Amino acid sequence: MWIYILVGIICLLAGLAGGFFIARRYMMSYLKNNPPINEQMLQMMMAQMGQKPSQKKINQMMSAMNKQQEKEKPKKTKK
């Protein structure tokens, strides 16, 4: 009788771990394919703040944001 409970708990833990890693992988690929901010959104935000966005300025801000994301990646993988 106790073996069924033990097997059930082990299966539950394995399912939770598997689900977590599948969901994590899905979200990583989703965010890589669909970044949370793009050039059009950045241009609109700058216009709302009263700045006239030039393409050079937008490219600089996008590259700075990408560098920041790349810098944060190694910190997350070490944990």
Swiss-Prot record:
Membrane topology recorded in Swiss-Prot or TrEMBL: Single-pass membrane protein
A Pfam short name: UPF0154
InterPro entries attached to this UniProt entry: UPF0154 (IPR005359)
Keyword match Transmembrane helix: yes
Keywords associated with the record: Cell membrane, Membrane, Transmembrane, Transmembrane helix
Membrane-spanning residues: 2-22
Source superkingdom: Bacteria
Region spans: Disordered: 57-79
Any one GO cellular component localisation term in the record: plasma membrane
Residue ranges, compositional bias (Polar residues): 57-66
Cell location: Cell membrane
Keyword Transmembrane helix tagged: yes
UniProt xrefs under HAMAP family: UPF0154
UniProt family annotation: Belongs to the UPF0154 family.
Name recorded for this polypeptide: UPF0154 protein Lm4b_01315
Origin species: Listeria monocytogenes serotype 4b (strain CLIP80459)
